[in-house]
């Protein structure tokens, strides 16, 4: 459990948030995402409508660009990684430059946790020195963009030429 360490680093690095609130969020939100997805089908036939004959099939998309904000630098990347792994996709996290250290630590801790389960080391990546240009390049190179942030970031995701999902104030 690295909730306290990550909370302290996030508050110190970003200058945002209350330490105790960050600890609680780090502990509770990530677990909530996991428990919400546990046992749910995310591959193959996930629904069949006998009446209409329609079959819903889920498959991996490829590489996900996970754009994360400085306001939630731990739980947002962790959640995006959980979603990507559940759907058998690779993910590259592009943290906000003002939260790069704490976000990178969170990503690397997740990599350490999943490695014993056979998850390839490069399936989860993080941009260590993020910038607007690197994030834009990532969005153009990936298969889908999942962006959390303000209006300029979400607009950039929607303008990337890739399928994009925007969440946050810019949505």
What are the roles of these predicted feature ranges?
Residues 8, 75, 104, 136, ...:
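Alpha-helical elements of the RecA-like P-loop NTPase motor core of helicases
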Residues 42-113, 161-162:
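Conserved small-residue-rich beta-alpha loop and adjacent elements
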Residues 63, 126-171:
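Conserved NAD(P)+-binding/catalytic subdomain of aldehyde/semialdehyde dehydrogenases
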Residues 112-126:
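A glycine-rich helix N-cap at a beta->alpha junction
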Residues 1-55:
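N-terminal Rossmann-like NAD(P)+-binding subdomain of aldehyde/semialdehyde dehydrogenases
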């Amino acid at each position: 459990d690295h909730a306290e360490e990550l909370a302290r680093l996030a508050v110190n690095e970003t200058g945002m948030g209350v330490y105790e609130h960050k600890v609680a969020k780090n502990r509770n939100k990530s677990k909530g995402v996991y428990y919400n997805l546990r046992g749910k089908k995310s591959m193959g036939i996930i629904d069949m409508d006998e009446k209409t004959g329609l079959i819903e099939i889920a498959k991996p998309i490829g590489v996900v660009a996970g754009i994360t904000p400085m306001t939630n630098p731990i739980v947002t990347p962790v959640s995006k990684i959980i979603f990507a792994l559940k759907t058998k996709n690779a993910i590259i996290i592009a943290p906000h430059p003002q939260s790069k250290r704490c976000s990178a630590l969170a990503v690397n801790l997740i990599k350490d946790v999943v490695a014993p389960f056979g998850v390839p080391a490069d399936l989860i990546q993080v941009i260590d020195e993020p910038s607007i240009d690197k994030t834009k390049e990532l969005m153009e190179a990936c298969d889908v963009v999942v962006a959390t942030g303000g209006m300029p970031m979400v607009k950039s995701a929607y303008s990337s030429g890739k399928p994009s999902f925007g969440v946050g104030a810019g949505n």
